[in-house]
A protein has these predicted regions:
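Active-site hotspot residues in diverse enzymes, especially metal/ion-binding acidic/histidine motifs
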Residues: 1-273
Length: 273
């Protein structure tokens, strides 16, 4: 990636970050910020082997999806990656679908690399990283970083251990050798134990399995049911996401014949068509 392009991406990432609510160093809740920015956010547990996320244009909306079977830290990075596609690429494309290859950074596709760089700048801006190392790691210049320090960075910036290492190495805060050493420490001590030892956010290392669907999509669900596209069981599952029952929307339903079974995963798939 050319330096001029990287500079442009940094500017756009930092400009968007200024609209977000931040703690001492990190964005407090990127999911809420996504909604505040006007995007329609869907969070659903598609499975550990499924795609991590996607972004698409649907009518006048921009729909962002994240798979809540991912560890929370990875789901947050996936969301930041999808926001990168929105800011950088969505004017010239209708959708992007991302998996482990594109999110982890092994893809050679230029747009995927740019979205990853945007996400890194959004979540861990270089000036905030410098400030953290200066103010929070007293002996950084002399002794470098430990795995416990990385766990603290995870909690402050709401990122994964791997993402913290990637960003620190890219900013020349650690060498390739130091990265391997920290990786080995991580493997020996385990991220969950490291987070506990520093009083960090242990949820970052766990999948939430949460279901969040924009409320207006209930109309889409009802319409599918009324046109025999989904069975009552699927309708009821969808209503549970909104804490509703059949009786709450009875006046919007039409009499219909029983349709073939189809689950909520298929319904969400229909939203992406």
């Amino acid at each position: 990636m050319l330096e001029n392009r990287k500079r442009d991406i940094r500017k756009q990432a930092y400009a968007l970050r200024e609209k977000c609510k931040v703690s001492r160093y990190g964005i407090i809740d990127l999911f809420r910020e996504c909604e505040r920015l006007g995007y329609k956010l869907l969070r659903y547990p598609l499975g550990e082997d499924a795609d991590l996320g996607f972004v698409m244009k649907k009518d006048n909306d921009i729909v962002v999806f994240t798979n809540t079977c991912s560890r929370l830290a990875r789901e947050i990075f996936t969301l930041a990656h999808e926001i990168g596609h929105i800011v950088l690429h969505l004017e010239k494309a209708s959708s992007f679908i991302d998996n482990t290859i594109t999110i982890v950074g092994r893809s050679m596709d230029e747009k995927e690399q740019e979205a990853n760089y945007f996400a890194s700048c959004l979540l861990m801006p270089d000036d905030e990283v410098d400030k953290f190392l200066d103010l929070e790691i007293a002996d950084f210049a002399d002794k470098g970083l430990t795995a416990m320090d990385i766990a603290r960075i995870m909690s402050e910036f709401n990122v994964s251990f791997e993402m913290a290492l990637n960003r620190l190495e890219n900013l020349d805060k650690i060498s390739g050798y130091e990265r391997i050493k920290l990786d080995n420490e991580r493997n020996q001590l385990r991220v969950g134990n490291l987070l506990r030892s520093v009083g960090g956010n242990q949820r970052l290392n766990e999948a939430t399995g949460e279901i969040e669907i924009p409320y207006e999509y209930i109309e889409y669900v009802i319409d599918n049911y009324n046109h025999n596209a989904i069975p009552q069981e699927t309708l009821e599952k969808a209503l549970e996401c909104y804490h509703l029952t059949i009786e709450d929307i009875r006046d919007k339903l039409v009499e219909r014949e029983e349709a073939e079974d189809e689950d909520l995963d298929a319904l969400l798939g229909g939203i992406t068509d």
